[in-house]
Amino acid sequence: MVDDKEKNMKCLTFFLMLPETVKNRSKKSSKKANTSSSSSNSSKLPPVCYEIITLKTKKKKMAADIFPRKKPANSSSTSVQQYHQQNLSNNNLIPAPNWQGLYPTIRERNAMMFNNDLMADVHFVVGPPGGTQRLPGHKYVLAVGSSVFHAMFYGELAEDKDEIRIPDVEPAAFLAMLKYIYCDEIDLAADTVLATLYAAKKYIVPHLARACVNFLETSLSAKNACVLLSQSCLFEEPDLTQRCWEVIDAQAELALKSEGFCDIDFQTLESILRRETLNAKEIVVFEAALNWAEVECQRQDLALSIENKRKVLGKALYLIRIPTMALDDFANGAAQSGVLTLNETNDIFLWYTAAKKPELQFVSKARKGLVPQRCHRFQSCAYRSNQWRYRGRCDSIQFAVDKRVFIAGFGLYGSSCGSAEYSAKIELKRQGVVLGQNLSKYFSDGSSNTFPVWFEYPVQIEPDTFYTASVILDGNELSYFGQEGMTEVQCGKVTVQFQCSSDSTNGTGVQGGQIPELIFYA
């Protein structure tokens, strides 16, 4: 009897733990069981236990109901993303009851605490006075993500503060760092990436800092290279510094004319003016320095006078290699700027004209600039009677490189019938977007040599992407053309691949035709 009672109690307990849907089925099954039991009297077990006996057969189904496999996982991920979007600006959201069960991974559950007051045991007042934002935090999560936070909350000198003020970090950058720590997600934007890098460096979050540097290297251009150079030195990022110098050297005139150049500090200004490899006319360097001086006067609340411009430039003025300017540039530009003293102007004029040159404080040796490299894609060239005429049609080829380079121009063939003049329109495109073009004339001497035709400014080329090089030539004479073209050419440390272009309407392709050379800086 005791054994029967224990069995009955166990069955009843199991039944009470079942979902309602299973209980309902149990009742129906019990009725059938009672009917058969009364008629045959073959079973002495309580009717309710009939369903318990089949519980093992339903175990898989119940587990599937409790732990769905595919659909809930997607919806969970979607809801987490939606929650993140809301939580960037709203930190007072209260999760649904039993929210832990909605997210299968610790990463997703941890992400629910991002910018959330729930269980927060510390708050940060982030940003400068007048632009602060109060953000919640959880000491354990922060300490796991940053050694600085660990020392702050659990170290020997830890202070038990409920509120911590951080005036030197922008709220958006601090949130980006918190999102990485809580959610293991990197969310960077062009307007906040530098501030995020500062935060990642300050709180020693190295993987986020590396992601910021990669983002900056990818978005590096002549427009922002000078500012990023200044910041890379501040953050002690030598790789980023080197990338900045590569852009500034190759696209010096674009970089010097950019608005960002005027935002650099004095130390960076000196570094750029001292640079031996700048590919720029010295008059452009001079004008850029004056533009910087004007903005610096505004930063120092000084009147925009010639005296103050010279004052803020200081000794950096003598890093400009004024004696190396073309005489016309000096006479019409620097000499009339008012920045030079009368004695300096007279001495520089004498430097240009006199046999006995005066001593100058300015550097009188021209910059070396960068030496252009040439990628020649044909193994031979030829000419045949009535073989290659232009007639205003387009010769085009596509190419890709494995390292960032700067295309300065193309090397083109000339006349095979003696000296001749050609009009050339050169163009460089990426996915149909024109990146650079120029219209110029060049003379050929009848030889099979190539003749350079330059873009106004070198064009930055990113690796592993095909670009289209095109030229439309206008000339009456027959021209040389290339033969035995190569699909891949090694030029120093740069590998260049070639393929045919659909823009080519004059016969140029990989195996033969025109545009024999790419001229570039690397």
Curated annotation (Swiss-Prot):
Protein name as catalogued: BTB/POZ domain-containing protein 3
Cellular component GO terms, alphabetical? cytosol; nucleus
Spell out the PANTHER family in the cross-references.
BTB/POZ DOMAIN-CONTAINING, BTB_POZ DOMAIN-CONTAINING PROTEIN 3
**Main role?**
Acts as a key regulator of dendritic field orientation during development of sensory cortex. Also directs dendrites toward active axon terminals when ectopically expressed.
Which Gene3D superfamilies does this entry report, sorted A to Z?
1.25.40.420, PHR domain, Potassium Channel Kv1.1, Chain A
Ordered alphabetically, the record's keywords are: Cytoplasm, Neurogenesis, Nucleus
Q: Which CDD domains match?
A: BACK_BTBD3, BTB_POZ_BTBD3
Residue intervals of the BTB domain: 120-190
What is a GO molecular function of this protein? identical protein binding
Q: Where in the cell is it found?
A: Cytoplasm, Cytosol; Nucleus
| GO process annotations (BP) | cerebral cortex development; dendrite morphogenesis; neurogenesis
**Which organism is this entry from?**
Homo sapiens
* SUPFAM superfamilies the record matches: POZ domain (SSF54695)
| Ranges of compositional bias, category Low complexity | 32-44
UniProt xrefs under InterPro entries: BACK, BTB/POZ_dom, PHR, PHR_sf, SKP1/BTB/POZ_sf
Residue span of region Disordered: 25-44
* One family name in Pfam for this protein: BTB
Query: Which residue intervals define the domain BACK in the entry?
Result: 235-300
